[in-house]
Amino acid sequence: MMKEIKTEFKNNTIAIDFDGVIHQYSRGFQGLDNAYDPPMPGAIPSLQKLKDAGYRLIIVSSRPVKPIRKWLEKYSLSHFFDDVTNIKQPAKYYIDDHAIRFDKTDPNAWHKTIDFIEEGGDK
């Protein structure tokens, strides 16, 4: 069972990547206008939980906005998102399948980041 989530900060935006996070993206890139898979397992109840907690959800993707909006309509998910953009927005959190966590308080953060990449990351 998922724990209750509470928003406590002024910036209550969560920026979410599209391919591989919301859209399953099982066959990789098939063209900018081709979003071919259904939603990722667990995405819909998780999006609902975030909305219920008062978060503003936006999709930030390198894919053009129009095919994402079309896909959201196809799967009746448009109501979850306050915006769809291909420009990075200020957000409290970013959910992305290719992100590397960077701890700005760690003086060795860059060293650890390079080590992670050189070791093959999450393979």
How should these model regions be labeled?
Residues 1-123:
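HAD-like aspartate-dependent phosphatase fold
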